[in-house]
């Protein structure tokens, strides 16, 4: 690459030549000493490439060393977990190593995304439930838990698939040590069994899988499923709250606690809460299973706050509301006037699925590898999530209302209770549920996560706009043709979307005001830490560029972040650049949990850290060009690749279009700024940011051939 940065990216031609030479040798099965020599040269040329590990695994497998081949393949999987070649390799290796469930998971990933190869497996009777459950998740999308795009079952005809969900059972996910799996139940405030009975009736219908799921609400509780008598272990002289759910209507148990026995009547797939003094014994009336949630011990600690509250307002753009914040969100503005507001805060991603794991881990999507919503791989357990870290401190971690987007990926695995909605996240429910949650568990320290999508734009076909929007807009602005396949980030700048946004924003603020008033009336300032933030901005206030929506424009990525409570400076509007990755280390500092050295998040200077010199927003969506914005206070480098992003998140940066602009005129070619000083600042940072997803023009033929609409059918 040239020293003057006049060319942004040059591929390593020697490494590319070595890759294609190794590819040709592998195709011939020529795994000899010359192959090893070429592999050594390739690894020297590309020391961090997962492709070298794939070739090493193929070599070892050819020579009968499946165990060490798996070590290499798993190293490749750690870096590139959404990769067809890696999946095929691991499926073969795990089968050879007598790891049939792991092999089946890899087959599921491959078939779910590419439709091949056909399944080949053998599971023992005691492996069927786990294996088929894992396969069902692997075949489906990464969002929507506990829904299953397809559910794998064994019938007389063999392996069959049906529309379904996980309900009244544990989610087959990998949990941290000493954590129980999420047991999937319905969420209900009234009659215990009604929702469960309706779900049981509708779960396999097209009507539910296509429409009904949008109104469904679930409660995922870390719990153990048991049959027969059981013991609930609680230390002596300790009071704890224990969630218990049944699997049938009015399921009867007898519970013995503190020397007395009591009858319990449970609902079908619904949790009820019980206060216990010390350990308890349960005697069921029959052998039907039931679920016992992880006990929640009561008690406060001076090392913790009584309430740490995170509120995600999905799609709220600070760039849109900053000039009128006090007028359009008066309750929120009043509450956070006693805290700190970040004025230059940007999301890393343009939509929720990759953005939420960034917030929950402090890592960019290149490091979480959660970016492809058609894949459901899990975060490695050594990536500690925000909820896990808070649970380690002794907080009761719960989400009174949360999206179902990132449960399968593991980004939400530290929440003991997670009320998940696949689609509908109204702020009215959010506020009321939160107050009920705080009241119910006011004898313990709580870390709560909330998520509302009221202001998020949706494709208008079949969507119900805010009532006042429908009654006040004339037909010329209210009714129009639209492609039902247009995603929210590509919605145009139209009056109906904008009017819906402003009216919904007032609704959100009204309900937040209700919640904030409750908090101020019941907590001292030293006992709270409240954060309000968004995961991305909003496309419907973004000017089109050459007829297309700029999905990482300022208004689409200029996000919201404000904090109030113990340790937060009061009355500050901070101009330093911040990222959605920065919430994680900030809470680590304020709440005193350890933060790994290798995260991407930065502790803001206002909390004792160091100011960022740039902030990054990008779009890493398979089948679309990769886009990047590197912003300072005054300028922005904008990049777009010529080629589309592959399913594994990699892309070729050769010939990428790059320009530097004033922040106020991004992508306006009349304002391009081309100076050696700016190139020397921006280009090294942009290169470092994209380096881990740059494929150097090296492609696996099987992946290219599977996406002719993206790559023209050329390997």
Q: Which residues fall in each region the model found?
A:
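Catalytic domains that recognize anionic headgroups
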Residues: 2-24, 54-55, 112-116, 121-715
């Amino acid at each position: 690459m040239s020293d003057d940065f006049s060319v942004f990216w040059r591929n390593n031609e020697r490494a590319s030549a070595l890759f294609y030479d190794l590819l040709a040798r592998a195709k011939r099965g020529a795994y000899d000493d010359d192959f090893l020599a070429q592999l050594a040269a390739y690894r020297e040329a590309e020391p961090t490439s997962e492709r070298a590990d794939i070739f090493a695994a193929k070599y070892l497998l050819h020579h009968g060393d499946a165990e060490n081949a798996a070590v290499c393949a798993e190293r490749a999987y750690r870096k590139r977990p959404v990769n067809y070649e890696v999946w095929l390799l691991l499926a073969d290796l795990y089968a050879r190593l007598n790891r049939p469930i792991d092999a089946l998971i890899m087959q599921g990933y491959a078939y779910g995304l590419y439709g091949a190869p056909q399944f080949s497996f053998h599971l023992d009777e005691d492996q069927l439930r786990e294996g088929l459950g894992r396969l069902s998740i692997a075949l489906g999308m990464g969002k929507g838990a506990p829904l299953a795009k397809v559910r794998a079952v064994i019938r007389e005809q063999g392996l069959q698939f049906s529309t379904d969900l996980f309900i009244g059972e544990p989610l087959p996910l990998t949990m941290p040590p000493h954590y129980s799996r999420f047991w999937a139940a319905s969420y209900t405030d009234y009659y215990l069994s009604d929702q469960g009975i309706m779900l049981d009736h509708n779960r396999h219908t097209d009507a539910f899988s296509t429409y009904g799921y949008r109104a469904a609400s679930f409660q995922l509780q870390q719990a153990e499923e048991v049959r027969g008598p059981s013991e609930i272990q609680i230390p002596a002289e300790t009071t704890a709250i224990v969630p218990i759910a049944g699997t049938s209507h009015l399921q009867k148990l007898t519970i013995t606690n503190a020397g007395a026995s009591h009858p319990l009547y449970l609902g079908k797939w619904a949790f009820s809460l019980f206060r216990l003094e010390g350990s308890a014994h349960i005697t069921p009336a029959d052998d039907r299973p039931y679920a016992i949630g992880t006990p929640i011990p009561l008690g406060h600690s001076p090392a913790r706050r009584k309430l740490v509250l995170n509120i995600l307002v999905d799609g709220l753009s600070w760039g849109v509301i900053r000039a009128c914040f006090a007028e359009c969100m008066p309750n929120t503005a009043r509450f956070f006037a006693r805290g700190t507001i970040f004025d230059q805060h940007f999301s890393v991603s343009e939509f929720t699925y990759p953005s939420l794991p960034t917030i929950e881990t402090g890592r960019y999507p290149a490091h979480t590898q959660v970016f492809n919503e058609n894949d459901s791989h899990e975060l490695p357990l050594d990536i500690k999530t925000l909820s896990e870290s808070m649970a380690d401190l002794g907080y009761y971690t719960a989400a009174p209302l949360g999206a179902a987007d990132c449960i399968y990926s593991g980004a939400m695995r530290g929440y003991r209770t997670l009320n998940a909605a696949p689609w509908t996240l109204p702020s009215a429910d959010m506020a009321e549920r939160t107050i009920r949650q705080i009241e119910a568990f006011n004898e313990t320290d709580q870390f709560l996560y909330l998520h509302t999508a009221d202001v998020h734009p949706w494709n208008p076909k079949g969507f119900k706009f805010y009532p006042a929007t429908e009654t006040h807009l004339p037909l010329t602005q209210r009714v129009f043709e639209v492609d039902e396949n247009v995603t929210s980030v590509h919605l145009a700048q139209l009056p109906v979307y904008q009017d819906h946004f402003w009216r919904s924003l007032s609704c959100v603020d009204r309900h937040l005001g209700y919640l904030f008033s409750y908090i101020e009336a019941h907590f001292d300032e030293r006992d709270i830490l409240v954060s309000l933030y968004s995961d991305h901005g909003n496309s419907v206030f973004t000017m089109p560029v050459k007829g297309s929506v700029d999905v990482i424009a300022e208004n689409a990525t200029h996000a919201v972040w404000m904090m109030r409570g113990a340790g937060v400076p009061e009355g500050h509007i901070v101009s330093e650049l911040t990222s959605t990755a920065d919430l994680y280390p900030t809470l680590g500092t304020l709440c005193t949990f350890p933060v790994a050295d290798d995260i991407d998040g930065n502790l803001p200077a206002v909390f004792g850290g160091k100011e960022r010199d740039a902030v990054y927003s990008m779009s890493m969506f398979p089948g679309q060009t990769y886009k990047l914005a590197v912003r300072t206070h005054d300028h922005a480098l904008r990049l777009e690749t010529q080629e589309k992003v592959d399913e594994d998140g990699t892309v070729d940066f050769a010939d990428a279009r790059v320009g530097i602009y004033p922040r106020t005129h991004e992508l306006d070619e009349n304002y391009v700024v081309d100076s050696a000083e700016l190139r020397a600042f921006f280009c090294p940072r942009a290169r470092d940011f994209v380096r881990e997803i740059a494929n150097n023009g090296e492609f696996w033929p099987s992946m290219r051939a599977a996406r002719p609409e993206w790559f023209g059918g050329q390997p």
